[in-house]
Amino acid sequence: MLHGGDYNPDQWLDRPDILADDIKLMKLSHTNTFSVGIFAWSALEPEEGVYQFEWLDDIFERIHSIGGRVILATPSGARPAWLSQTYPEVLRVNASRVKQLHGGRHNHCLTSKVYREKTRHINRLLAERYGHHPALLMWHISNEYGGDCHCDLCQHAFREWLKSKYDNSLKTLNHAWWTPFWSHTFNDWSQIESPSPIGENGLHGLNLDWRRFVTDQTISFYENEIIPLKELTPDIPITTNFMADTPDLIPYQGLDYSKFAKHVDAISWDAYPVWHNDWESTADLAMKVGFINDLYRSLKQQPFLLMECTPSAVNWHNVNKAKRPGMNLLSSMQMIAHGSDSVLYFQYRKSRGSSEKLHGAVVDHDNSPKNRVFQEVAKVGETLERLSEVVGTKRPAQTAILYDWENHWALEDAQGFAKATKRYPQTLQQHYRTFWEHDIPVDVITKEQDFSPYKLLIVPMLYLISEDTVSRLKAFTADGGTLVMTYISGVVNEHDLTYTGGWHPDLQAIFGVEPLETDTLYPKDRNAVSYRSQIYEMKDYATVIDVKTASVEAVYQEDFYARTPAVTSHEYQQGKAYFIGARLEDQFQRDFYEGLITDLSLSPVFPVRHGKGVSVQARQDQDNDYIFVMNFTEEKQLVTFDQSVKDIMTGDILSGDLTMEKYEVRIVVNTH
């Protein structure tokens, strides 16, 4: 298990005493892996063509001397001032067509040949010098790729991308973007510009294609970065760190990670949940952490890496509250339980100046191993040292929820429904909740992944759906799968053009219904549905449904669609399809999905009886179940093991009742 984090010795080159202390503190903190060089370009190449690698040579040797490993970063995330000054084409241009000044980070032009050449060259030098060093574990490409550039170079690249996508046919493009609307038809490629608040931003097809282009151009930039690394170090794995947006930990929207995942050897991501906030319970937030972990793990169906987190507070939330005692261990073990093979922090040593000098770190400004945060990091390290056999183990699931970046983009761009209540990823989290509460493993997959391994596939709010996806959902259900779809699904195709002539005929065949209209409610509006003799509250969206051949499971109670279907079920060949026409309260989700859990014989990997707020997650290999029992409440909780298990940390055999303290985690193993 990797334990450590972002280490920036380049900030302390004038303090050899600090660098010496770092090595001592690494051993005391039970850390073993360090991401080095992420923003070090100015230290590596202070002037164009003048290189200073000696300090990095020394760091490699120091870390190697204690048995540590280095995740070596390429430095493109922040460039030296001389590079911006000498080659202004590398500066990003924003959507309002304003060229940015030098400064900040993550703000280069994605297309600039100069910047691509410069990054490829410095990367080659790093690979030549450190590619065969025994401490080198992995390449960390740039840092948190994101954002877009609207300069002339990028406009040209975008037009070339469009020519390729639309077979050099403006007629095809004009149809796909529905440009006759507002007389926006293009008759020359040079007329096309990227979306802009001072230009075109109302063509949804253009907006969607721009986002696709930015993803492809970012991947192209990344692929340029790794050319020398693949050539010189073909056996060293490569990653780049993905992100999620707080406070709800929704997948980062700047890039389609489902595409990017195909180009990395391992998924890694930076997790910064707002623990101990004042608007939700610890368990509610833990559920959201579980969801995003299961999405990023499922991208490659293999363990991922937690590349960044904080051992205590961050510096960029609205309120930067410290992790309470025990929370760093609990939150770290949750990451491991959901598939991570690492706990890596930002930052190892707290910066003395600039914007992140107050961001949490393993080593604080006091330079002491005696403070609470350092001691809790050391405890995480001691725990991880006992979990080496968990590395590489999987989390097999029979249930999947489908998340789609392009659908998210299109739905957010749609000028309809209600902007504040679309909440696509939060809706997926609501459907995920019942399975998390029942400790049932879930894969959060994308539309291109294989549906066949699953008994149950849940597809909420799939507003954008292609013919290919419809066909694959049809095959999944016909072959015996159980499919759940909701309101605001099947509205547009991959060009963000609406389907005409009613709901897609294959969707009508699968579900035995046709949605006729969607009623969008004001945030304070409420309705209700009756389901199995119980009344459940409904808000935000209600679909008026025409039943063809389906069975009615629930009906609306009020408004002009009172006594009409709200939830339906339909036998389709060997499978079954449910359509949920309204946004319903959490208790409906629990009751509905508990019925499917029973019908489909879905179960936890290893059953542990517990109360609300305790999560039990497991990883498996052929011989063992590694079970993480986690108390995400502020109270003591009773859990019960009906079978004997071995506590990995103590070696004790546990059975029957066990009282857990608040924020406590117990890790046990069940041998098959």
UniProtKB/Swiss-Prot annotation:
Matching InterPro entries: Beta_galactosidase_C, Beta_galactosidase_Trimer, Class_I_gatase-like, Glyco_hydro_42, Glyco_hydro_42_N, Glyco_hydro_b, Glycoside_hydrolase_SF
- Quote the catalytic activity from the record: Hydrolysis of terminal non-reducing beta-D-galactose residues in beta-D-galactosides
Q: Does the keyword Metal-binding apply?
A: yes
In this chain, Zn(2+) is annotated as bound at 109, 149, 151, 154
Q: What is its EC number?
A: 3.2.1.23
Q: Which GO terms describe its molecular function?
A: beta-galactosidase activity; metal ion binding
Q: What happens when the gene is disrupted?
A: No chromogen 5-bromo-4-chloro-3-indolyl-beta-D-galactopyranoside (X-Gal) hydrolysis. Reduces beta-galactosidase activity observed with polygalacturonic acid, citrus and apple pectins, galactan and soy flour.
What pH behaviour does activity show? Optimum pH is 6.0-6.5.
Chain residues that bind substrate: 105, 143, 316, 356-359
- Coiled-coil zones: none
Entry note: thermal dependence: Optimum temperature is 50 degrees Celsius. Thermolabile above 50 degrees Celsius.
Main enzyme class: hydrolase
Pfam families from the xrefs?
Answer: Glyco_hydro_42, Glyco_hydro_42C, Glyco_hydro_42M
Activity regulation (UniProt): Inhibited by zinc, cobalt and copper ions.
Quaternary structure and interacting proteins, as annotated: Homotrimer.
This molecule's function is given as: Involved in galactan degradation. Hydrolyzes galactooligosaccharides released by the endo-beta-1,4-galactanase GanB from galactan. Degrades galactotetraose, galactotriose and galactobiose, generating galactose as the end product. It is unable to use lactose.
Matches recorded under PANTHER family: BETA-GALACTOSIDASE GANA (PTHR36447:SF1)
Q: What is this protein called?
A: Beta-galactosidase GanA
* Source organism per UniProt: Bacillus subtilis (strain 168)
